[in-house]
Amino acid sequence: MRGQGRKESLSESRDLDGSYDQLTGHPPGPSKKALKQRFLKLLPCCGPQALPSVSETLAAPASLRPHRPRPLDPDSVEDEFELSTVCHRPEGLEQLQEQTKFTRRELQVLYRGFKNECPSGIVNEENFKQIYSQFFPQGDSSNYATFLFNAFDTNHDGSVSFEDFVAGLSVILRGTIDDRLSWAFNLYDLNKDGCITKEEMLDIMKSIYDMMGKYTYPALREEAPREHVESFFQKMDRNKDGVVTIEEFIESCQQDENIMRSMQLFDNVI
């Protein structure tokens, strides 16, 4: 059951590779190894020393690895006190195990990393923007971070809790292809009315190009975002009614090999 004040998750550096260009407009990006390293920087607690399941060959550089965190034990006096000091107390591990596709051990490690970044137990939009901007210092990621935050904050209360974080992370990392595509659709559906308009997609495209900064400018022509939106709709809007529904979105993505390949980038990150 969802606890009071609960929303839906933080996380995912949407820095996919060039094969995802058909869907997001990203210019050619890092390899899966580089993506994984960036993801591990977002959550230092997910380094190989914390999660034994992480492949050593894809681990973050040693300089990025913090000390190995002590597992969270909800039955210990110390951790009980630690949990009592945060503004938002997370649901029990057993309940989160049932709601996500993470093991108890993974949830323990994720909680410690989340609390290190967000001692109060929740993160608001401004803090989220600050965290996200670290990964795109060459550009302006604020608009894209807002869209991403709203996708995680599904109850629209202006904050993301640990439960939200792991719920979204579970979809991104462990969800089925349909689950991931549905999550992506929700990200692009800015007003959450069940369809994507050209105006919404243009806002997304502009925010992506702004975020990538010097990796797209000055080579990027001013009209490039709008041209990409037209290409997107020509591909996705099957019945030509001017909007893209979730059914059209998922069907079109599933028929695109490049998009399907890019959806595998987060497999086995942790």
From Swiss-Prot:
Biased composition (Basic and acidic residues): 1-17
InterPro entries, sorted: EF-hand-dom_pair, EF_Hand_1_Ca_BS, EF_hand_dom, Recoverin
Name recorded for this polypeptide: A-type potassium channel modulatory protein KCNIP2
Gene Ontology BP annotations: action potential; clustering of voltage-gated potassium channels; membrane repolarization; muscle contraction; positive regulation of potassium ion export across plasma membrane; regulation of membrane repolarization; regulation of potassium ion export across plasma membrane; regulation of potassium ion transmembrane transport
UniProt membrane topology term: Lipid-anchor
Keyword line: Calcium, Cell membrane, Ion channel, Ion transport, Lipoprotein, Membrane, Metal-binding, Palmitate, Phosphoprotein, Potassium, Potassium channel, Potassium transport, Repeat, Transport, Voltage-gated channel
Binding site for Ca(2+) 2: D189, N191, D193, C195, E200
Cross-referenced PANTHER family: CALCIUM BINDING PROTEINS, KV CHANNEL-INTERACTING PROTEIN 2
The keyword Ion transport is assigned to this record: yes
Stated family: Belongs to the recoverin family.
Subunit description: Component of heteromultimeric potassium channels. Identified in potassium channel complexes containing KCND1, KCND2, KCND3, KCNIP1, KCNIP2, KCNIP3, KCNIP4, DPP6 and DPP10. The KCND2-KCNIP2 channel complex contains four KCND2 and four KCNIP2 subunits. Interacts with KCND2. Probably part of a complex consisting of KCNIP1, KCNIP2 isoform 3 and KCND2. At least isoform 2 and isoform 3 can self-associate to form homodimers and homotetramers. Isoform 3 interacts with KCNIP1 in a calcium-dependent manner.
Species per Swiss-Prot/TrEMBL record: Rattus norvegicus (Rat)
CDD domains reported for this sequence: EFh
Subcellular location as annotated: Cell membrane
Region (Interaction with KCND2): 257-270
Molecular function GO labels: A-type (transient outward) potassium channel activity; calcium ion binding; potassium channel regulator activity; protein-containing complex binding; transmembrane transporter binding
Lipid anchor positions (S-palmitoyl cysteine): C45, C46
Stated role: Regulatory subunit of Kv4/D (Shal)-type voltage-gated rapidly inactivating A-type potassium channels. Modulates channel density, inactivation kinetics and rate of recovery from inactivation in a calcium-dependent and isoform-specific manner. Involved in KCND2 and KCND3 trafficking to the cell surface. Essential for the expression of I(To) currents in the heart. Required for normal protein levels of KCND2 in the heart ventricle.
Tissue: Expressed in heart, brain and lung. In brain, abundantly expressed in striatum, hippocampus and olfactory bulb, moderately expressed in cerebral cortex and lowly expressed in thalamus and hypothalamus. Isoform 1 is predominant in cerebral cortex, striatum and hippocampus. Isoform 1, isoform 2 and isoform 3 are equally expressed in olfactory bulb. Iisoform 3 is expressed at high levels and isoform 1 at low levels in heart (in PubMed:11263977).
Region (Disordered): 1-34
